Amino acid sequence: LCLRIIKDHLEYTRLKKNYRLLDTFDQQYLVFRNIYKFRTISGIEHVMPKGGAWKWAQAICEFSNNLTEEVVDIDAMLSDPDMEISTIAKVVNTYQTMLDEENLIDFSAIQTECYRLLTEHKDILEDLRNSIKYIMVDEYQDTNYIQEQIIFLLGNHENICVVGDDDQGLYRFRGATIRNILEFPSK
């Protein structure tokens, strides 16, 4: 859904025509190929795991995915007095700059770009809301924070039906939380 919304409103995104979608391996390989760009970041050795460039690439992707999916303000992190926090923000900024320069988007960025599009362009959000009568989400226990926010934006907190089993949360590694389904009735 998010990718379709982006495609339909591409001119309002950071992407240009003919952008390329990265899967998990492509994302990590992109970072691996460009690891030299990260090695120059002051203090990076304090936030990276021991090991070679592939381990670093994996950690960089995890930082970016986790912060993106939680809609964390990277600019606020950059000015944080804690050196580790500001270093991680520099790492994520460097990665996001690479995506922009090469006209790429990864799975987490799809969600963030869609969320940004919906929150910054109220006319697009209203058009989408008017075209959607009901939202049904299966496996709701596997949604993450940003996915839930997009669902609530599109549904305007109305006519949303979710189905899931809090004993079957499988995507915690992608930021999914069973808290979404447990707290859904109160939202």
Task: Explain the meaning of each model-derived region.
Residues 1-113, 122, 130, 158, ...:
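A basic/glycine-biased coupling hinge at the interface between accessory DNA-binding modules
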Residues 2, 124, 135, 140-151, ...:
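Catalytic P-loop NTPase motifs of RecA-like helicase/translocase cores
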Residues 115-119, 145:
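Short gly/ser/thr-rich secondary-structure transition/capping motifs
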Residues 118-134, 155:
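Short basic/glycine-enriched coil/helix segment immediately N-terminal to the Walker B
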Residues 131, 139, 165:
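Walker B catalytic acidic pair
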Residues 145-187:
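Conserved RecA-like helicase ATPase core segment
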